[in-house]
Amino acid sequence: MTASPTNGSLAAVGDAPDLSGLPGLDPSWSRMVTVPDREGTPRTWHLLDNGAEPVHGTVLCVHGNPTWSYLWRGLLAAAPPGWRVVAPDHLGMGFSERTGQARRVDQRIDDLGTLTAALGIDGPVVTIGHDWGGIISLGWALAHREQLLGVVLGNTAVAQPAGDHGPPLIRLAHLPGIRPFGCVATPLFVRGTTALSWPALPREVRDALALPYGTADRRKAVGDFVADIPFSPGHRSYDTVAELAEGVRGLDVPTLMFWGPRDPVFGERYLADLRDRLPQARLHRFEGASHLVTEDAPQYADAVAAWLGDLTSVAPDVPLTSTPTNVSEETLWTALERRAQDPSPVMSVAGSVVSWQSMAARVTELAAGMAAAGIRPGDRVGLLIEPSADLTAVVYAAWRAGAVVV
């Protein structure tokens, strides 16, 4: 059970920054703590913490670049009873200490582990990550499997899909001739990130997201984060990220993905790669949302809160995944699974062609959703759906969940 801080290495320090007046943020969530890093050097962190008694567990929120813990304010506000929500600012980011040193992804994962240990977070834990925070959160998850209850991801990536050279916007910012100017000397990268949303975010929200990054000194880690993205072999973090990307395939815990499909950074190829690595994931698309999906679709917080509720309400023997119930080797959906990557048509309805690939993905999503909603093997399910591709998908999903269609 996640506990209140008891570790002697944790020290409360100074006053938290004055965050009063920031839209949607309760200033009482803000706190500063000092924790030794793996070299034993004391490091001062800023974090948001709703302070709830973790009856069910803790949600560990990990932001990306160039955001900060403010990104997660909606989830702190929407958290169901019994869930503690902790959202730290990475070292060098937000209102955490500027260490003066570039920190690689493996160091940031280790930093996060030392922080959670000092905060007394020992499970159950649900990780949630966005942007570069996605792979850091997954790195923490892989290092703390015994504490891990679930994984949530929003518009992120763990690998470059085959044939992909990386997001053009990030590759541009990554160039040695561009990065010092665009990411550090000027707020171009910081302000450009908030400009990806359309309609535009309210000015006060854009200003709040940029608040910790007002000077070049405070933006140094923004450039360091970009420099640490391994686009090719030989990069200092390439092997670490590749190992993490493969390790993710072994995470068999319940998983939720929430996605802004208008993202010019992490498009559909990155989502497809994640779903291939985490096939049990339930997906929520928020149409019209871009890269900052938490801002463009604030209702994501309600979706995550509902999913957290499912984690604690579903019977232990019914996983929140798309894994079939106990069946023989050959099932009613075996043929569909065998052709899950086949783009050829499986059916045509009213001029609309449905591929084997899309049908298999839809059945997987629906089956996981049915299990999460409480459908048990042997349950009788009535369907009020007109003959269509949707009906076919729902029937197969019901069978896969172990239900009987009547």
PLM region spans:
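Alpha/beta-hydrolase fold catalytic core
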Residues: 1-59, 80-83, 121, 227, ...
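Active-site loop/oxyanion-hole signature of alpha/beta-hydrolase fold enzymes
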Residues: 41, 48, 87-129
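Conserved serine/cysteine hydrolase catalytic core
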Residues: 218-276, 285
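Catalytic histidine-centered segment of alpha/beta-hydrolase-like enzymes
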Residues: 289-301
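Short hydrophobic alpha-helices that are characteristic scaffold elements of the AMP-binding
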Residues: 396-404
